[in-house]
Amino acid sequence: MRGRDEETGEFHDKSRSQNRRDALDVLALGEKLVSLTPAQLARLPIPEDLLPHIAECKRITAHIAHKRQLAFLAKHMRREEEATLDAIRDALDANSETGRREVAMMHRVEDWRERLLAEGDKALAALLDDYPQADRQQLRTLVRNAQAEKAKNKPPRAYREIFQVLRALMLPAALGLKASAEDADPVESDEADED
């Protein structure tokens, strides 16, 4: 039973409507968790006792049975601390934000690739202004090869390679990291020494 504070007249506990809204929020969170891949689930701070329930919910595909299993998962999730559920929500939000940034970065890479193929050296100069660490000669050669492949109706090998080079160039900047060729070389040489 809910009680009232005699002095202020306010209720001590949540209303029944608020409890329902909270339960629906937890159910929606459970649906999101069930829709994730195992690799994505591994990155989230999910308590070990919830993992079997998530796996069971993924396994069941019949509509009503799946819905019932989701409700069962939500019941177990409501037993967890609110801080645990908030941590899961925050991690999901961070993952979705990272995904949106990666998609936006891929679109920028595709735009630059199309611009390089359409405008040539003019676009290359603009790219080098934004990314001075880019290899001018490599990009110029790839653009020339991609244009030749397109003219001869050959497979777009250089076209794809331009994408890979631009992605490697823009990814560290998009994620806020500083990377250079010198940073990558020691890792490769260490791995070569171990073999």
Swiss-Prot record:
GO terms for molecular function: ribosome binding; rRNA binding. One of its GO terms (cellular component) is cytosol. Keywords: Cytoplasm, Ribosome biogenesis, RNA-binding, rRNA-binding. InterPro entries: DarP, DarP_sf. CDD domains: YjgA-like (cd16331). GO terms for biological process: assembly of large subunit precursor of preribosome. It is found in: Cytoplasm. Gene3D superfamilies: PSPTO4464-like domains. Pfam families: DarP. Member of a network of 50S ribosomal subunit biogenesis factors which assembles along the 30S-50S interface, preventing incorrect 23S rRNA structures from forming. Promotes peptidyl transferase center (PTC) maturation. Belongs to the DarP family. This is Dual-action ribosomal maturation protein DarP. It comes from Stenotrophomonas maltophilia (strain K279a).
